[in-house]
Amino acid sequence: PAHRPQTYWQAIQLYWFTHLAVTTELNPWDAFSPGRLDQHLYPYYRKDVEAGILDDRKALELLECLWVKFYNQPAPVKVGITLKESATYTDFANINTGGVTPDGRNGVNEVSYLILDCMDDMRLVQPNSNVTISKKTPARFLKRACEISREGWGQPAFYNTEAQIMELVNAGKMLADARRGGSSGCVETGAWGSEAYILTGYLNIPKIFQLTLFNGYDQYSGKQIGLKLGEAKDFKTFDELWAAFKKQMEYFVDVKIRGNNVIEKLYAENMPAPCLSVVTNDCISNAKDYNAGGARYNTSYIQGVGIGTVTDCVAAVKYNVFDKKNFTMEELIEAMEHNFEGYDAVYHMVHDKSPKYGNDDDYADEIMQDIFELYRSTITGRPNMRGGEYRIDMLPTTCHVYFGDVILATANGRKAHKPVSEGISPEKSADTHGPTAVIKSCSKMDHLATGGTLLNQKFTPDVVAGETGLNNMASLIRSYFAMDGHHIQFNVVDRQTLIDAQKHPEDHKDLIVRVAGYSDFFRNLDKPLQDEIIERTEQSFS
């Protein structure tokens, strides 16, 4: 700016003015992140401390004032499904703490620890606070973040610095820009200050496989919405079924991208963002608006939803119908049409006796890899309207509840209208071999080919209690990140507390849970979303 901040306080104030400007311009909804807030503030912090005009108490107080500002930021008006499921989440401002510096050194500093203390003191659902953990991150910093997480209010989330950087580099970003980047919104990765990345909406992958089994006919709406590629009972081999699934995937991705491109063109022509363009690299030199392709990088993301559910569905069909011939496709379809009522034998086979993603089972996990690659290859590299390209990420926000509501019974034994799996997490109750098996299954996905993946884990408080529990939690994070996992977050709360909070919300007004890439008060969630959180598997290290 023309008048640069001279003090720590002024630097915080400048950020808040900038944040207000861009969010107000966009009414106020786009998940803007302040970037590496700890690294941006650190030079001012050191200067003021050395000058004797700032101590840690005052520095923390100013951060907490900023947190209050974030919390009071008016959220966009919710409508439709979003209003019903989670009407109170705010504007997804995401504070990244830790990571590395633009030249690759450890980025943790004194302000990083002050931000952790601020999170712990304030315990607000907004801003969305996370820590980025690199191989160079001190153990003390990770353990302090784990201490806060195990207190049971859903923050901070944990991100893999090296994975974030490689995701951006693999997408064509310069290394220095990638190191300055990180995660905003839910879990998506961007090159802050240089990239206009837009989340274009969600793709219901289990629904596409369901339509494949029913020859493009949608049981929910009673309409033919997919391609007619043949009745499932007529497929003689699994390869024939897979070929039909591939064609349906390509068809629905084409429909989605055509719609997205119309919207992007409308934004470019009718929705200029002058303030955002001023603070985004290359918009001025390119003489183009942020929404018209002026930024250095211009990415459009499509979010895949339900990878756990669809993996188990495909695995159940392949294992039981084609490999073991436990029953015919016709028998499975008939059981699904009746919501498995009166078809206990088929239900037991698909729900309890078939390979499941999330257990380090190569049979299921290789199917997950195939589905992921089909999804990735169908989307990644497609041109958008801003001179950039489409890429993928794997996150649901809350739409996994709605996506499940529009699907009747599925081939994995999931009953009609139940939520599908969220993020890259396994289907509820399918992961029976503990958290280590979960992260090993999840790590078989190519995270570095995405713009972000979301993994939820749930522990009861006793599992992460004491020094042993704390060390186990930190080790789980380090192990997952060593296998290129992008993100992991925790709900530390027991099932009975959640059930009681559902029945007696007046007694649990301050209960905060991690939903997807954000936290919210449990009492403010719609009942189906509350049920989904209650039903998540409670993990144990034993």
Identify the residue ranges that each predicted region occupies.
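Conserved catalytic cores of very large enzyme subunits
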Residues: 1-308, 313-542
